[in-house]
């Protein structure tokens, strides 16, 4: 199991936790002094109260929680949000309210999930042309949307 250093920046902060034994993502909770209301079609930056030291070659991805998206139309506009291995600041979550009603975030609310993933650095090799494939340049629904 990968060990990641974490600092609680606020004594009231909840550290990330897996909700089930086989969950891919850890729940991230809001660490705020007063409730924050996110009006429809607006965003809010929500602090978590902790900072990470990810090992080189890893990133943390912040993703929406499916229940918030389904029930309240709350998501992350930049999903997945990336936390780089060399970032040492507080983890904060940008939430957006796609719904029609204001949404209240309170201290301790689980607002996102975090997945730690290995990343590979790449070096590009510029060439005159790319190898061919059956797919070619087809994209953006070129295979259709109905049953096959």
Swiss-Prot record:
Keywords recorded for this protein, A-Z: Hydrolase, Magnesium, Metal-binding, Nucleotide metabolism
Enzyme class: hydrolase
A molecular-function term among this protein's GO annotations: magnesium ion binding
Required co-factors: Mg(2+)
EC number in record: 3.6.1.23
Amino acids binding substrate: 65-67, 78, 82-84, 92
InterPro entries: dUTPase, dUTPase-like, dUTPase-like_sf, dUTPase_trimeric
GO annotation (BP), single: dUTP catabolic process
Organism superkingdom: Bacteria
Family statement drawn from the similarity comment of this UniProt entry: Belongs to the dUTPase family.
Function: This enzyme is involved in nucleotide metabolism: it produces dUMP, the immediate precursor of thymidine nucleotides and it decreases the intracellular concentration of dUTP so that uracil cannot be incorporated into DNA.
The protein's name: Deoxyuridine 5'-triphosphate nucleotidohydrolase
Source organism: Pelodictyon phaeoclathratiforme (strain DSM 5477 / BU-1)
């Amino acid at each position: 199991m990968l060990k990641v250093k974490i600092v609680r920046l606020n004594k009231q902060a909840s550290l990330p936790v897996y909700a089930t034994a086989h969950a891919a993502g850890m729940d991230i909770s809001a660490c705020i002094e007063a409730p924050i209301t996110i009006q429809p079609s607006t965003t809010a930056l929500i602090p978590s109260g902790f900072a990470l030291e990810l090992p080189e070659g890893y990133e943390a991805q912040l993703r929406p929680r499916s229940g918030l998206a389904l029930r309240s139309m709350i998501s992350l506009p930049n999903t997945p949000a990336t936390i780089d291995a060399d970032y040492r600041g507080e983890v904060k979550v940008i939430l957006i309210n796609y719904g029609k009603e204001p949404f209240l975030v309170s201290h301790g609310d689980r607002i996102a999930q975090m997945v730690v993933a290995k990343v590979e650095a790449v070096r590009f090799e510029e060439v005159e042309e790319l190898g061919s494939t059956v797919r070619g340049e087809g994209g953006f629904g070129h295979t259709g949307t109905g049953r096959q």
